[in-house]
Amino acid sequence: RIGKGTVIYPCVVLEGDVEIGENCTIGQNTRIKDSIIGNDTSIQSSVILESKVGNETSVGPFAYLRPNSEIGSHCKVGDFVEIKNSRLDDGAKAAHLTYVGDSDVGKKVNLGCGVVFVNYDGSKKYRSVVEDGAFIGCNVNLVSPVHVGKDAYVAAGSTITNDVEDGALYVARSKGKSIEGWVEKRGILKK
């Protein structure tokens, strides 16, 4: 079923039971299988499998929504973002280069570039929760299972292995060190 005013561009593949709301734009090279897309939503060059996408949400380009993913309304799932068996609540954003696996992400959460939910330990998968309003900085690893509290702020480059309290700033990274003359002593980059 395709709603009134929806535009579907060439090279789009719709498989199985697909429902697309009104006034959507489905861009070229998109594949949607057994999924529901809300109203006024834009999907650009992406793959959506057995998932739900809310109203006024933007997906892509080059996003991958794997089975059992649910994206709320007013969300952004940008380029090279993969979401698996997870929920992004209303207003959440994962703009680029992010992996969200087996997790629940609250309302108006911002996931910075390069955020990875580390959900698999080699034998079991674990689930994490990020509460409403949290800000997760660029290149953060959330080693599941962890719980990030409401309005918490996780600093860029951190690896999170413990829960983060509501409203807290969490920084987990080593102090940088510059070793002068190291390149020359090792003979690296000789011209």
Where are these regions (language model features)?
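Short, charged, intrinsically disordered terminal tails
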Residues: 179-191
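Structural signal for interior beta-strand "rungs" in well-ordered beta-sheet cores
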Residues: 1-171, 176-177
